[in-house]
Amino acid sequence: MSFEVIPAVDMKGGKCVQLVQGVPGSEMISLDDPVEVALDWVSQGARTLHLIDLDGAIEGNRTNAPIIKKIVEKCKPQGIYIQVGGGIRSFEDAATLLDIGIDKVILSTAALKDPELIKKLSDEFGSEHINVALDSKNGKISIEGWTKESEHTAVEMGSQFEEKGAGSILFTNIDSEGLLNGVNPKPTEELVNAVTIPVIASGGVTTLEDIVTLKNTGAAGVVVGSALYKKRFTLTEAINIISDKN
């Protein structure tokens, strides 16, 4: 499987936003139409879209559900793979998204509180459709929209969720997220080496060199948000630099 650069479309209040370290009210970027943003990434070469419902993650409501459905309707016919996270707290939440054509659901807090949920979803829908998000701050996993810290490390939880049937892991280094200060590859590399399922990296990408650095950890891909929206580089440039290195 080739390394993939995946643009993030984070939604809050019906808009596409980028937060600093996930903090509500810290919007660096706010664009009116997430559907247009998604289509723009597709036009630039995106094969996968990473959609995050921040209202779902922070407050538990599904106000962005109609937008997600519209993105699916516009992008799926073009063969685009869509993964969605944010506020998926139950089997029913995940099933609803998978039923409308989402390819992969991303669970975080719900998985940490009830690891058996991953097994149930994997048994029902197949592990390739189930991703667990591990968000690390100061070496420990954060939950509930990054507002609380757990006692567990990413390596501990990654191994546990692989056993439960997760098909992939999204690993975010919150210490770097949204700051545009560059990446620390070590935590990603440690997790990649601890599990056999694909790990998608996230957090802190600022330059094209950061993308190459994360590729070299053995990660399967990288989610990029702030750097693209701040025009540090284009998605096409990011895709091309990976192609050049393959």
From Swiss-Prot:
Location in or out of the cell: Cytoplasm
Pathway: Amino-acid biosynthesis; L-histidine biosynthesis; L-histidine from 5-phospho-alpha-D-ribose 1-diphosphate: step 4/9
Active site: D10, D135
Tree of life domain: Archaea
GO MF annotations in UniProt: 1-(5-phosphoribosyl)-5-[(5-phosphoribosylamino)methylideneamino]imidazole-4-carboxamide isomerase activity
InterPro entries reported for this sequence: Aldolase_TIM, His_biosynth, HisA_bact_arch, Isoase_HisA-like, Isoase_HisA-like_bact, RibuloseP-bd_barrel
Principal location: cytoplasm
Xref: SUPFAM superfamilies: Ribulose-phoshate binding barrel
Catalytic activity, as annotated: 1-(5-phospho-beta-D-ribosyl)-5-[(5-phospho-beta-D-ribosylamino)methylideneamino]imidazole-4-carboxamide = 5-[(5-phospho-1-deoxy-D-ribulos-1-ylimino)methylamino]-1-(5-phospho-beta-D-ribosyl)imidazole-4-carboxamide
Keywords: Amino-acid biosynthesis, Cytoplasm, Histidine biosynthesis, Isomerase
GO CC term, one of those recorded: cytoplasm
GO biological process terms, semicolon-separated: L-histidine biosynthetic process; L-tryptophan biosynthetic process
Enzyme class: isomerase
This enzyme's EC code(s): 5.3.1.16
Family: Belongs to the HisA/HisF family.
PANTHER family hit by this protein: 1-(5-PHOSPHORIBOSYL)-5-[(5-PHOSPHORIBOSYLAMINO)METHYLIDENEAMINO] IMIDAZOLE-4-CARBOXAMIDE ISOMERASE
HAMAP family, sorted: HisA
Descriptive protein name: 1-(5-phosphoribosyl)-5-[(5-phosphoribosylamino)methylideneamino] imidazole-4-carboxamide isomerase
Organism: Methanococcoides burtonii (strain DSM 6242 / NBRC 107633 / OCM 468 / ACE-M)
Organism placement in taxonomy: Archaea, Methanobacteriati, Methanobacteriota, Stenosarchaea group, Methanomicrobia
Gene behind the chain: hisA
